[in-house]
């Protein structure tokens, strides 16, 4: 699934997506985990917010951002993403290449025209980022 933060396109595996909903303001909390400084309510659940926009030094775009709920190995977490609706893409395994960037943990990337779209390594979010 391809989404954007600050106009930059990123991807996650659809199996790692738990849902998309309107963004609601999070509740700030103290945390020693880099880029997790708040929590968000979704129904009865209280989930950590991973601030990928701050990590990438970007700002979420749009007046009505979306909440991307992802399945992290330690439990679901959410991210605020641009208001542009995410798009599903089907890729052949051969289309996935090594991500050359060093700005985020990625399981690989794929080419879309001249753009290289990184595929986030969800399991590494919040654990190794400083």
Model-identified regions with their sequence ranges:
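An acidic, low-aromatic, low-complexity terminal/linker signal
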Residues: 1-130
